[in-house]
Amino acid sequence: MSAFTPASEVLLRHSDDFEQSRILFAGDMQDDLPGRFECAASRAHTQQYHHWQLLSRQMEDRVRFSLVAEQSDVADCDTLIYYWPKNKPEAQFQLMNLLSMMPVGCDIFVVGENRSGVRSAESMLAEYATLNKIDSARRCGLYHGRLDKQPTFDAEKYWGEYQLDGLTIKTLPGVFSRDGLDVGSQLLLSTFTPHTKGKVLDVGCGAGVLSAVLASHSPKVRLTLSDVSAPAVEASRATLAANGLEGDVFASNVFSEVTGRFDIIISNPPFHDGMETSLEAAQTLIRGAVRHLGSGGELRIVANAFLPYPKLLDEIFGFHEVLAQTGRFKVYRTVMTRQAKK
């Protein structure tokens, strides 16, 4: 990958300033700049499995994927470069976690797109560091300050939950639909009938709400859940545990870590990567589903009605049907037959 994001391009304008720095990169790292940046030493921590996949090719064991960063991730770093995400609670969780371990006096750089709200980093960190804007370009802001005081951090305080049809849904910052069931997932769930059976794969599981609701009225299903997000993986595990449900939950970039075949694959695939519209994950889902569905197995997804999934479903599977729709969303179903492109 050679193309850098606007945020990385702004950082590169200051590359000479980092030659002697020992840098910890974190946040929404959507390119491989952390692995190519010229500095004295570099490490990275990410909550996104696909970012870990990209960075580990160059950084190897100097990049780690997990929900919470540990002291070993910070090691002897004297500089934090943080890529601001689109989700403010996610930024709060990550920055408090990282800065609770970074040494007082360390340099803090926060970079991100203006429309993602990067400016709020100033107020968020005001108690711990005074940030000043030092550059503005490519519709991004770059802020710098030094750590005056370490915050305290307790990951347990960031957990949230909501109730849905007698189920407890556990959530964390950065998890999709953290505050309640989204309308797309609600529409998808409305298409399932009780007593569904077989092996179910929930791709992009978020807080595990689809699987939990499905298993609550179809106890014979065998659940497998995956997501690229560490908070989502942990939230899904907690959701299943809170409701006495069992399932295999793990991190995967769509099908990258998935093995075997399933009777049903369900998903409410994301179409935003950061602040940009991205169809890549859903296209990978549809194209890859043929390798993970048994004969007669079905793919059932919900998507914004304007997205061009019908054409792709027809191209790969030979047909599709619309099970439910509103003005904004459609639930698509297709089945693994001999005519599917394997």
From Swiss-Prot:
Subcellular location(s) per record: Cytoplasm
Enzyme nomenclature, EC number: 2.1.1.172
Gene3D superfamilies xrefs: Vaccinia Virus protein VP39
Molecular function (Gene Ontology), one example: 16S rRNA (guanine(1207)-N(2))-methyltransferase activity
Keywords: Cytoplasm, Methyltransferase, rRNA processing, S-adenosyl-L-methionine, Transferase
GO cellular component labels: cytoplasm
Keyword S-adenosyl-L-methionine: yes
Swiss-Prot/TrEMBL catalytic activity: guanosine(1207) in 16S rRNA + S-adenosyl-L-methionine = N(2)-methylguanosine(1207) in 16S rRNA + S-adenosyl-L-homocysteine + H(+)
PANTHER family: RIBOSOMAL RNA SMALL SUBUNIT METHYLTRANSFERASE C
Assembly with partners or alone: Monomer.
General function of this protein: Specifically methylates the guanine in position 1207 of 16S rRNA in the 30S particle.
HAMAP family: 16SrRNA_methyltr_C
Assigned protein family: Belongs to the methyltransferase superfamily. RsmC family.
Protein known as: Ribosomal RNA small subunit methyltransferase C
Organism the protein comes from: Enterobacter sp. (strain 638)
